[in-house]
Amino acid sequence: MKLGCICGCFNRAFDARTMDQRGFLEHCATTLRVQGVELQDIHFPQTRPVYLQALRRTATDLGLAIVGVGVHNDFGRAATTWRQSEIAKVKQWIEVAEALGAPQVRVFAGHPEGPASERWPAMIAALREVADFAARAGLRLGLENHNHGAFTRTADDQLRVLEDVNHPALGHLLDTGNYTDGWASVERTAHLAVHVHAKFWQVAPDGSEPTIDYPKLIAMLRRRGYEKWISFEYEAAEAEATGIPRALAYLRRLIDAPPGD
């Protein structure tokens, strides 16, 4: 397994303008010492080719893999014009990911406006369309399970979306902290993961996440032959400067430990 870091870990620093994308890359390489980074649409100051080329070159020079780009899309609105604009947005970020050499784009199913059953067919069609586009670009889409009234709050929801879309370019991106029923759905879907977001809502003194059994998760992924990326994701209230290094060190110890420890 390979350890990466999501730029959203530093949302507060980005919002305060004390960190930009280049600074994030440098921090990941020299201070956090992770192998890869996951970027998000909300942190790009621009997407002109010259900027993307420079960003990709910076990551390469620092020895970092850009493992994915996250887009904040929503295919749950009733209005056709809204969905079409969201489809166009996802396609744009697929092109950005391709320019950066990233193999994956994180997507959401979205939040249904009204009954989910009424919005479901259009959401499935939208995901299938962007999956087709990603496939033509040679990329994969990672569908992240999400809460807060989203389509994919439980394992049943996530599995149904993946089955209904039924596209080889759309895979399960497991977010360990987003299922409304917690571990039960994590355990049911971990075997399908093409990518993992290791969420930290809290950080204990030893760096562990009190609400998520990461030793059990890492052991389960290892038994199932998972050798892909685990992207660290920090959303705890504790300051980024203290919470992130402690939590990341804990996660690294679990990943680096010999099997059976």
Where are these regions (language model features)?
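N-terminal pre-domain/capping segments
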Residues: M1-A99, H167, V203, A237, ...
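Hydrophobic faces of well-ordered beta-strands that scaffold small-molecule active sites
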Residues: L3-G8, Q35-L39, I66-V71, V105-V107, ...
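Conserved, mostly hydrophobic/aromatic
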Residues: C5, C28, A59, A97, ...
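Active-site-proximal loop/turn and secondary-structure-junction residues that shape catalytic pockets
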Residues: C9-N11, D41-H43, H72-F75, A109-E113, ...
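Gly/Pro-rich active-site loop or hairpin
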Residues: F10-Q21, L25, T81, S117, ...
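Active-site acidic/histidine proton-transfer and metal-coordination neighborhood
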Residues: E26, Q53, T58-A65, G76-H172, ...
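Structural motif
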Residues: T31-L32, L100, H191, R224
